[in-house]
Amino acid sequence: MPRPLIAAIAKAILLLDAILILLALAGAAYQALGRSRDARRFPQHGRSIQAGRIKLNLDCTGDRSRGAAMVVLDSGSGVPALGWILVLSEVAKFARVCSYDRAGYGWSDPGPEPRTSIKIARELKALLEAAGERGPYVMVAHSFGGFNVRVFTSLYPADVAGVVLVEGSHEDEDQRMMQLLPASVIEREAKADQRNERIHRIMGPLRVWLGIQRLQIETGWGTPDYGMQSSRLPKRLREEFLYLRQQANFGRAVAAEGRAFPQSVAEIRKAGGLGDRPLIVLTAGKPLDPDPILTNEQMDKLENLWIYDLRLQEAHLSTRGKQIIVPDSTHMIPIDRPDAVVSARVPQWRRNRWTSAIR
């Protein structure tokens, strides 16, 4: 190859490298300026409290009447404490209630791995004690948070007066649902899980740092829908949720919980039932979105498994368990039907009496 051509190629490569570096620096500056602006727009909900080796964000409101339990809210995977915003304000009208950001979420520090339910439950216990928020508690959990509060109950049984599982995860759901799916769907879902794990663990923080995700959101191109972009939420809250999703620690935390999920499943199997504690299981009854690969019969079987089998099993975790189907809600009941959560949960606990507003 002629030397002039080699020199030209080398110059082109150097120029390309310089352009990429400048773009990366520009993206990082764009992200830093945007983050500074957002931090002023969206002040912290709650306060940071030292819980062992890390600081966690705890948001408590409402008064605690004598003899009443305090309500503690735990979110699903990928949802910060902000996901309870429509529930929190209503419960606070008649009870003391606290939501919190798990390690790496929202305004909380990242936590040590593996991010199993036992570790999460112990961190929550340390947080509540450090904040002076004493039991007994009514533990309310959405999705993956259900694992955490069930483990919490097994570790600290004297602290838990009652439980509300809002579309709580079931230890057998993946295995049982896979039995109903064709091989093509199983392969598709496995690839999607692997891709999402890589995005959260590696590409997610990089996209945040370079300002790529912010650019997508602010230009309206590819704005992600994480269940918190519902029209039920005011525009400012939707923007605040996207701001919290743009923190690099957030993607790492979601990925870490996902990697530790098999361990959490093993922990929940050992945790056992909930005894005779009052238990309400809220179940989304809205039909699943159609899947082009699945037949109507297969979709019906999946819905029946989810609503009438797995969730009913959860209700049987306690001798005083009750399932309530919310017919017009998706999995995101705290957003779609916060009133159902408020009514179910606030079953108020006073001197060993559980009164539910839902009959």
For each predicted feature, which ranges?
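Flexible "cap/lid" subdomain of the alpha/beta-hydrolase fold that forms the substrate-access gate
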Residues: 117, 160, 164-310, 321, ...
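Alpha/beta-hydrolase fold catalytic core
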Residues: 2-70, 93-95, 232, 312-313, ...
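Conserved HGGG/HGGXW glycine-rich cap/lid loop of the alpha/beta-hydrolase fold
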Residues: 57, 61-107
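Catalytic active-site module of serine/aspartate enzymes centered on a nucleophile-bearing elbow/loop
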Residues: 309, 317-359
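Alpha/beta-hydrolase active-site loop signature
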Residues: 78, 102-106, 145, 170, ...
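Active-site loop/oxyanion-hole signature of alpha/beta-hydrolase fold enzymes
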Residues: 59-61, 99-140, 156
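Conserved hydrolase catalytic core segment
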Residues: 134-180
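The conserved beta1-alpha1 loop
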Residues: 72-76, 142, 167, 284
